[in-house]
């Protein structure tokens, strides 16, 4: 109940030679006149202090009387009592003992002399006997400042002398290692009494075939428990073999107590007899003997054997009943397990500390279990590989005298009490031996007890006999009457250890003949006990109490035949059940005894009801549940399985973890299992516990209704072929059990028939864990959720085992049944059609044939999540599968609870019911930690973390854990807040008032604008107004700390403007046109939040004025037409010159880029402005743009032909002479001029700088290979512009570069070719053959846009230009032209036409003037100004890429820039001037 109870043990004195004068008590086989005097209790007076109170704490422990006492008293009552005295039934009442748990140093209790371990006897003069623990606590608490305690000192308490100090030792860590190397237990410092070995040792040696020296000593042998000092006759001799401890010769055991280490047996630990300690030693032993004799009176007519204390047992052995000459005795809470054979059991003085270190709780089955340590110490070790020893003593020695290897039933051992301390729960991975033999006594010296038949009293009708096992059969065949009840000590193997077929560690133990089980007995005889060696049967699954149950441990434990439990259940007194409240306490398990046992059961249950109401231990409960379940199974086994072969397979089959194996491995239910141990339920309940349940399909595979598809918590009780489900757990009892079995509960649904059912883990259930699916034979389907995985597996295996048909071999699944069921299922599914299911996702695959069947059922036709892709039923439900799945998923998907819902539906904050909780939480976190965080709300958080928080909040804001690291990132919190407002279905500024806010913000009058905004805000709905008020106040707080976080109102407005002020159907147009208004509205609200949201109406008269000037709004009207469409780069109405550069830039912008449309619009405008500005500056600075550079060249060439409209600075005029061609005669007329005017493109503004030398010269720039287009254009230029004349030669002149024309300007080429054909003369071939002048490498691809340096002094007219001048002229091309040539790839004419036709307009005008052919240019040979003048008209006419306006300007500028000496030459060409003027006028 409270704390960890002490381990109480009897006093096992050291086996010393008993002086003949020492009086023997009744337990020694003789009556004792009176016990030796025992020191009385001490009385202490404690005074309460204000700080510490009384300064001590208590612990409660319940001591049950030995089980032998129960049977003795029952027998006496059956025989009418002994001597007609009063009924000793009162002796069966458990005894409450209260010990001092802790004493505070320096406290009142410490000063008064109270010590840890002292046992309370009286409180304030009032005895605690008969009082509960709570009543004793109440007495102490109700005391005044003075408390009088009567205590039994720990050193003098008979209940603790054997326990000694090891109960208080630390270091309960489990030991891991070899079984033979388990360390010795802590020393015991209480006195022991040794006796001289009797003279009958040779008789024992003769009775044991193997010499003792040949036996490998087992330090854990309970054989060493013989307690000659207490009730062992003086004739009894104990042999101690210390070979395991390195001692070569046996000697009288100074401390034959099993957990006594070697140090404790030294003279310093135990004074020699005769010392001053001896009297107290004798008194202690005699008092304990007297106390025990009072506890266990002998029944009348009982044959006396050497006295031996009854074995006290704990919950772990309660699972293995004890049927011997004495009926199984009541359990002691304090001991784990002790085996006893005969009239009295061995006492154990094992502390749970050491037991935990020994790694396992001890378990004993019955008095026969005593055989295990005794015989195994004497002869078992040598036969360990092949033989299993068994003794079958019965209640009557004449029937089955105990073997000599067993020392008499009464002359061995001591009674012990062990506690269920938490250290019990500890275990190691190496568990080798029998339960009580291995775990509590590891590391102790091996004690081989020798005893002769003379040790038996005269009442013994025949001497004991040693029954030798047959190594070949590994079986012991005792007399038939002894085979009726046989219990085998099971072995607890280490974790994961495989089955060991050696039966050496098993013992067959004889039981009484009250409940014979002939079938089970015959079965055991027939199989020579061999299957008992297998470790796969039911009782092997009983988990040890001191370990966490695991599926892999207990499967290997040794099993117990069914009749063992059956007989023990019929004969046993109440067996301890683990308290559900604590591992410390147990209570009596009610079993079948007789009619007289009902009162005992009721008394025990009622006496310690409180002991089972608090917390409970998993492992203890598991053990009891499993034992209870296995007991039920085994009791029904003979009637259920008529075949002996089936029975044998039941015990030996390991493939189906049957009956109890699965259940212990799967941690049986932990709810209220220990309290359901009534007579009726114990017989037929296989498993029970709390489950969550819902029904999926009703009979014939029909979909269950909505009410049945809800998860409900039920108490499930699994019986033979049914599973009962009730809302409440039924109290144990025959009536309740009968009602439950009949399904008569009012709140209980009809039991689920599990016969031939299919059960497996429900892998498709993803929302709940530990769910298994049950499909019955009539096609009903259920889902059950267990508490944990072990519980789920336990239920599955239990249902599988109980669902088998009668006589079905449990070794494998019934294939025929499954096939038949599968066929029936398919027939039903095809006739009734596919059924829908609620499982959301696909199955991960169910293992085994049954699982395959579950996946293939057509009832799940629509459940594609249950079927593999290749399932046969896919075709049945194929048409409906897609929408069916979508509907299921949509229905299953939980609606969001935080994001994407209206403000009215959000969970409200505590401080303001109209503000969403998520908004309040985020704002509070930011205000608490982020006021000084730089860029708060501007720096985004991690998108993945924000998304995870959104999902968490959508599941329910109640799950918010602010300690989660995701809530520690301020940027994540700020992004979460922005995401909340961004996902609102209706924005904070509602849709119906959005336009009003935009219009109000555009009011010119500042005061009026503020008033209008305030009125609109007040008109918002309640939730929206309150949320906006809360948010703006928060942003105001952030802005107040802008000097640290750098977030001024404007910055916050840039962040929250688009999020708050928007429409539900936000579009691009609104975003572009209203973005400045959105910013301004939010900024105004933040700046004047107090005025906007103030409840004071008077403030309306003091309207604040926005002192700041309105923000400059960029002119973005030109972007509006481009929204949503791709606009061609050129506009027909735009200026051809200004747009040409933009066209060239836009021509290679990828059209597929999403941002191209916006970038093009902006680039066009900027390019136009830049061109215009440069053109204006070019006139004053002497530099020119791409177009102007060519215009200036033509102006210089035309010279005096144009009226002087303007003067150009010197550089442009100086360049002109260098570009003049050889002179022509004034009277020559050029040929017809074909002009190709390509508007809107700037590449025609550049002239080719290659010069043809008179000699036909050299070709430089070998790398500049002309393509077809360039070659064709060169021919056109030379043929058209050249003249044929005698003696004439081709002079240096600028020629058209091929890249000056657009790739698709085929119309211009056609016109030029036709003109060339008309004007071609004798010198055409020479003109064609004229090579281009030298060109420095790289000049054609130069990207220099303009030359800003003034050129060097131009050479005289008619002189050859220098290389520097030629290079300067070549670099005049624009970057756009050069880049266009470089990027252009040769394409087919049609492709080029499709690509470029939309960017250009080609106008070909036939000039009224005739162009000069090559011969005419030759006749104009002679240098001088006249020749140069004669060429200019053609040059002017050749510049067909200029618009009319630009050409006019160029001619005027060129004429003004010519020197005065050239003006006279221009007067001879009046027709050309007039023709040019007419051309411009036409254009």
UniProtKB/Swiss-Prot annotation:
CDD domains: PDZ_ARHGAP21_23-like, PH_ARHGAP21-like, RhoGAP_ARHGAP21. Pfam families: PDZ_6 (PF17820), PH_9 (PF15410), RhoGAP (PF00620). It comes from the Eukaryota. Residues 316-325, 1099-1110 have a biased composition (Basic and acidic residues). The keyword Oxidoreductase does not apply. The modification Phosphothreonine is found at residue 652. Residues 1338-1351 have a biased composition (Low complexity). The record marks 938 as: Arginine finger. Signal peptide: none annotated. Keywords: GTPase activation, Isopeptide bond, Phosphoprotein, Ubl conjugation. Residues 15-34, 212-276, 300-345, 385-407, 448-485, 508-527, 827-848, 860-879, 1093-1150, 1171-1361, 1419-1469 are annotated as: Disordered. One of its GO terms (biological process) is signal transduction. Residues 71-155 form the PDZ domain. There is a cross-link at residue 850 (Glycyl lysine isopeptide (Lys-Gly) (interchain with G-Cter in SUMO2)). Residues 331-342, 1133-1144, 1236-1248, 1440-1457 have a biased composition (Polar residues). The modification Phosphoserine is found at residues 361, 372, 421, 515, 579, 607, 619, 655, 658, 673. InterPro entries: PDZ, PDZ_6, PDZ_sf, PH-like_dom_sf, PH_9, PH_domain, Rho_GTPase_activation_prot, RhoGAP_dom. GO terms for molecular function: GTPase activator activity. Residues 901-1093 form the Rho-GAP domain. The keyword Ubl conjugation applies. Residues 684-804 form the PH domain. GTPase activator for the Rho-type GTPases by converting them to an inactive GDP-bound state. This is Rho GTPase-activating protein 23. It comes from Mus musculus.
């Amino acid at each position: 109940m409270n704390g960890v109870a002490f381990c109480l043990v009897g006093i096992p004195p050291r086996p010393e030679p008993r002086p003949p004068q020492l009086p023997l008590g009744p337990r020694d086989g003789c009556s004792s006149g009176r016990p030796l005097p025992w020191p009385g209790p001490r009385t202490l007076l404690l005074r309460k202090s204000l700080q510490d109170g009384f300064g001590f704490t208590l612990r409660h422990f319940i001591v049950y009387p030995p089980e032998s006492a129960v049977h003795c008293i029952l027998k006496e009552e059956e025989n009418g009592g002994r001597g007609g005295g009063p009924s000793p039934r009162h002796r069966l009442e458990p005894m409450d003992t209260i010990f001092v748990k802790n004493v505070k140093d320096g406290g009142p209790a410490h000063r008064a002399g109270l010590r840890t371990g002292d046992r309370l006897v009286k409180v304030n003069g009032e005895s605690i006997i008969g009082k509960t623990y709570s009543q004793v606590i109440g007495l102490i608490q109700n005391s005044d400042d003075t408390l009088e305690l009567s205590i039994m000192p720990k050193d003098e308490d008979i209940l603790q002398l054997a326990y000694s100090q090891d109960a208080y030792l630390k270091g309960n860590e489990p030991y891991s290692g070899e079984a033979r190397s388990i360390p010795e237990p802590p020393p015991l410092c209480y006195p022991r009494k040794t006796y001289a070995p009797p003279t009958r040792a040779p008789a024992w040696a003769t009775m044991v075939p193997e010499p003792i020296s040949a036996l490998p000593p087992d330090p854990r042998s309970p054989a060493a428990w013989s307690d000659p000092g207490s009730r062992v006759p003086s004739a009894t001799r104990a042999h101690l073999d210390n070979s395991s401890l390195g001692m070569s010769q046996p000697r009288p055991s100074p401390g034959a107590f099993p957990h006594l280490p070697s140090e404790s047996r030294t003279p310093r630990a135990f004074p020699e007899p005769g010392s001053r300690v001896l009297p107290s030693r004798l008194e202690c032993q005699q008092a304990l003997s007297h106390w025990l004799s009072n506890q266990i009176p002998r029944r009348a007519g009982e044959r006396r054997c050497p006295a031996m204390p009854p074995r006290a047992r704990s919950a772990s052995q309660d699972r293995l009943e004890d049927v011997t000459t004495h009926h199984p005795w009541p359990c002691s809470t304090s001991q784990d397990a002790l085996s006893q054979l005969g009239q009295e059991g061995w006492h154990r003085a094992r502390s749970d500390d050491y037991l935990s270190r020994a790694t396992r709780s001890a378990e004993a089955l019955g008095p026969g279990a005593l055989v295990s340590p005794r015989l195994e110490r004497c002869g078992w070790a040598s036969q360990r590989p092949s033989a299993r020893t068994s003794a079958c003593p019965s209640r009557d020695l004449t029937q089955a005298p105990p073997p000599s290897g067993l020392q008499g039933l009464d002359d061995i051992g001591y009674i012990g009490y062990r506690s269920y301390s938490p250290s019990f729960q500890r275990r190691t991975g190496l568990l080798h031996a029998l339960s009580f033999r291995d775990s509590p006594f590891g590391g102790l010296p091996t004690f081989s007890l020798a005893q002769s038949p003379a040790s038996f009293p005269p009442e013994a009708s025949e001497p004991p006999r040693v029954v030798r096992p047959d190594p070949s059969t590994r079986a012991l065949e005792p007399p038939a009457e002894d085979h009726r009840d046989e219990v085998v000590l099971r072995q607890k193997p280490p974790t994961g250890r495989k089955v060991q077929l050696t039966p050496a560690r098993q013992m067959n133990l004889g039981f009484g003949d009250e409940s014979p089980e002939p079938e089970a007995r015959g079965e055991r005889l027939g199989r020579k006990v061999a299957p008992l060696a297998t470790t796969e049967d039911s009782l092997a699954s009983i988990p040890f109490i001191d370990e966490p149950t695991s599926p892999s441990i207990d499967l290997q434990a040794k099993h117990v035949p069914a009749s063992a439990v059956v007989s023990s259940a019929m004969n046993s007194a109440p067996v301890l059940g683990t308290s559900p409240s604590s591992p410390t306490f147990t209570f009596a398990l009610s079993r079948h005894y007789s009619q007289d046992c009902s009162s005992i059961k009721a008394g025990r249950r009622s006496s310690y009801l409180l002991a089972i109401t608090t917390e409970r231990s998993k492992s203890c409960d598991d053990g009891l549940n499993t034992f209870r379940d296995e007991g039920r199974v085994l009791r029904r086994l003979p009637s259920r399985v008529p075949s002996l072969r089936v029975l044998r397979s039941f015990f030996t089959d390991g493939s189906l973890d049957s009956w109890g194996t699965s259940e212990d491995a799967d941690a049986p239910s932990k709810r209220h299992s220990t309290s359901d141990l009534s007579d009726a339920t114990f017989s037929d309940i296989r498993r029970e516990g709390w489950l969550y349940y819902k029904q999926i399909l009703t009979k014939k595979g029909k979909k269950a209704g909505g009410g049945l598809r809800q998860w409900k918590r039920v108490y499930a009780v699994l019986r033979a072929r049914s599973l009962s489900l009730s809302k409440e757990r039924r109290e144990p009892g025959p009536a309740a059990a009968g009602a439950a079995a009949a399904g008569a509960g009012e709140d209980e649904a009809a039991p689920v028939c599990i016969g031939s059912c299919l059960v497996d883990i429900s892998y498709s259930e993803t929302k709940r864990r530990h769910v298994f699916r049950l499909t019955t034979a009539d096609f009903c389907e259920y889902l059950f959720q267990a508490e944990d995985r072990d519980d789920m597996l336990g239920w599955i295996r239990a249902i599988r085992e109980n669902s088998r048909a009668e006589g079905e071999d449990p070794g494998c699944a019934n294939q025929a049944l499954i096939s038949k069921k599968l066929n029936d299922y398919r027939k039903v599914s095809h006739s009734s059609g596919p059924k829908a299911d609620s499982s959301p996702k696909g199955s991960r695959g169910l293992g085994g044939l049954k699982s395959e069947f579950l996946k293939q059922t057509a009832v799940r036709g629509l459940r594609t999540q249950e079927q593999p892709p290749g399932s046969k039923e896919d075709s049945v439900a194929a048409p409906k599968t897609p929408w069916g799945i979508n509907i299921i998923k949509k229905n299953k998907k939980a609606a969001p609870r935080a994001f994407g819902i209206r403000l009215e539906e959000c969970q409200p904050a505590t401080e303001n019911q109209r503000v969403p909780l998520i908004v309040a939480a985020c704002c509070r976190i930011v205000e608490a930690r982020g006021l000084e965080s730089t860029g708060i709300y501007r720096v985004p958080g991690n998108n993945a973390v924000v998304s995870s928080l959104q999902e968490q909040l959508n599941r329910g804001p109640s799950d918010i854990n602010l300690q989660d690291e995701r809530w520690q990132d301020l940027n994540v919190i700020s992004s979460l807040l922005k995401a909340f407002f961004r996902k609102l279905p209706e924005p904070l500024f509602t849709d119906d008032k959005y336009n009003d806010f935009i219009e109000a913000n555009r009011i010119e009058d500042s005061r009026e604008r503020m008033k209008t905004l305030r009125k609109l805000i007040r008109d918002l709905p309640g939730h929206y107004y309150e949320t906006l008020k809360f948010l703006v106040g928060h942003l105001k707080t952030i802005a107040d700390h802008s000097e640290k976080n750098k977030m001024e109102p404007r910055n916050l407005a840039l962040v929250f403007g688009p999020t708050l002020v928007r429409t539900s159907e936000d579009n691009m147009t609104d975003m572009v046109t209203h973005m400045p208004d959105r910013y301004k509205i939010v900024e105004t609200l933040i700046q004047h939040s107090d005025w906007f949201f103030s409840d004071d109406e008077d403030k309306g008269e003091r309207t604040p004025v926005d002192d700041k000037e309105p923000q400059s709004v960029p002119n973005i009207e030109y972007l509006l037409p481009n929204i949503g469409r791709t606009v061609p780069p050129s506009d027909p109405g735009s200026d051809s010159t200004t747009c040409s550069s933009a066209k060239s830039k836009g021509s290679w912008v990828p059209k597929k880029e999403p941002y191209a449309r916006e970038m093009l619009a902006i680039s066009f405008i900027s390019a136009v402005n830049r061109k215009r500005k440069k053109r204006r500056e070019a006139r004053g600075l002497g530099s020119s743009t791409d177009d102007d550079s060519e215009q200036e060249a033509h102006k210089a060439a035309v010279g005096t032909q144009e009226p002087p409209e303007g003067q150009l600075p010197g550089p442009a005029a100086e360049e002109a002479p260098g570009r003049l061609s050889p002179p022509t005669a004034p009277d020559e007329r050029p040929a017809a001029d074909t002009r190709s005017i390509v508007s809107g493109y700037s590449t025609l503004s550049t002239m080719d700088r290659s010069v043809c030398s008179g000699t036909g010269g050299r070709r430089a720039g070998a790398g500049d290979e002309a393509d077809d287009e360039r070659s064709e254009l060169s021919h056109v230029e030379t043929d058209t512009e050249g003249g044929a004349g005698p003696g004439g030669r081709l002079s240096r002149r600028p020629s058209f570069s091929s890249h000056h024309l657009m790739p698709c300007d085929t119309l211009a080429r056609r016109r030029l070719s036709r003109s060339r054909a008309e004007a071609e003369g004798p010198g055409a071939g020479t003109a064609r053959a004229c090579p281009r002048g030298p060109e420095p490498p790289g000049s054609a691809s130069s990207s220099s846009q303009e030359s800003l340096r003034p050129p060097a002094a131009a050479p005289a007219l008619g002189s050859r230009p220098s290389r520097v001048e030629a290079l300067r002229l070549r670099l005049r091309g624009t970057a756009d032209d050069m880049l266009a040539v470089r990027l252009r790839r040769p394409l087919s004419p049609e492709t080029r036409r499709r690509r470029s036709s939309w960017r250009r307009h080609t106008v070909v005008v036939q000039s009224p003037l005739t162009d000069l052919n090559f011969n005419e240019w030759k006749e104009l040979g002679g240098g001088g100004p006249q020749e140069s003048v004669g060429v200019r008209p053609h040059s002017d006419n050749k510049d067909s890429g200029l618009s009319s306006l630009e050409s006019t300007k160029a001619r005027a500028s060129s004429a003004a820039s010519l020197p005065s000496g050239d003006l006279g030459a221009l007067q001879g060409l009046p027709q050309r001037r007039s023709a040019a003027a007419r051309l411009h006028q036409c254009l």
